[in-house]
Design a protein with these regions (language model features):
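Transmembrane alpha-helical segments that form the membrane-embedded catalytic/substrate-channel core
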Residues: 49, 106-120, 170-185
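Cytosolic, membrane-interface loops and tails of multi-pass inner-membrane proteins
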Residues: 1-3, 51-66, 116-134
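Helix-coil boundary and interhelical linker segments in multi-pass alpha-helical membrane proteins
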Residues: 25-40, 79, 83-104, 146-164, ...
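Membrane-water interface of alpha-helical transmembrane segments
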Residues: 2, 6-16, 32, 36, ...
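Topogenic membrane-insertion module of multi-pass membrane proteins
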Residues: 1-53, 175-213
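C-terminal membrane-associated helical module and adjoining short loops/tails
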Residues: 125-213
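Lipid-exposed faces of alpha-helical membrane segments in multi-pass integral membrane proteins
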Residues: 15-21, 41-44, 79-82, 102-108, ...
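Multi-pass membrane catalytic core of lipid/isoprenoid biosynthesis enzymes
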Residues: 12-17, 58-113
Length: 213
């Protein structure tokens, strides 16, 4: 039966679509100089990414649906954890040529990592149905916890300058394309990451957001 509209719209991809939408809202917030709300949207997008794979695995999917899931997840991740953080730091900084170069390189490294991951993931799924046990390099989603942490550090210490954000992006970008093997977090690890994210989000809302009112 011929499709009336391109794409897939079952529950297995809803969290991915929602994560991208939240990230785009975060980009708009960063452009509008609403930095703490931009970070909250980034973290919400990261929350969606944490669970979208588990949700997708609950449904028996055909080959096309699986391949679409791989592609759409990476495209969403590029916007959420590549473009949004780059725009955030650029808008927060002095917006000079060098900051723009670092932002561009950061997005490029995220793009290369995600494209390379897609190739590896399609090859892996062609020979096994088991879940991935580890990652090569730093997952792009890590920025959803690292960037708010640096922002909160600057806010609490009242330090001047934004060099820390530039250094963070350079280190994270290098991590994206590194070949260091990082074990995929299990249940306890995910709970710890979730709790860290919740604490960061609460700090952003109560100490930064309400403090600005």
């Amino acid at each position: 039966m011929k499709k009336k509209i391109l794409g897939y719209y079952n529950y297995t991809v809803i969290l991915t679509y929602l994560g991208m939408a939240l990230a785009f809202c975060g980009i708009l917030q960063a452009i509008g100089q609403n930095f703490w709300t931009s970070l909250v949207f980034l973290m919400l997008s990261g929350l969606c990414d944490m669970f979208d794979g588990a949700v997708a695995a609950t449904k028996e999917r055909d080959v096309s649906e699986k391949r679409f899931g791989i592609q759409i997840d990476s495209l969403s991740d590029l916007i959420s954890f590549g473009v949004l953080p780059a725009v955030f730091v650029y808008m927060l900084s002095d917006k000079n040529f060098y900051v723009g170069i670092v932002a561009t390189l950061y997005v490029l490294c995220a793009l290369i990592r995600l494209a390379y991951f897609n190739v590896l993931e399609e090859e892996r799924q062609a020979v096994t149905t088991e879940s991935r046990k580890s990652y090569l390099g730093l997952p792009v989603t890590s920025i959803a916890l690292l960037l708010p942490a640096v922002y909160l550090f600057y806010d609490f210490t009242a330090l001047k300058g934004k060099l820390g954000f530039t250094v963070l992006r350079i280190l994270v970008a290098a991590g994206f394309v590194s070949t260091v093997e990082i074990k995929k977090p299990k249940i306890i690890g995910k709970i710890v990451l979730l709790l860290v994210g919740v604490m960061e989000a609460l700090a952003l809302v109560f100490f930064v957001g309400w403090g600005a009112v």
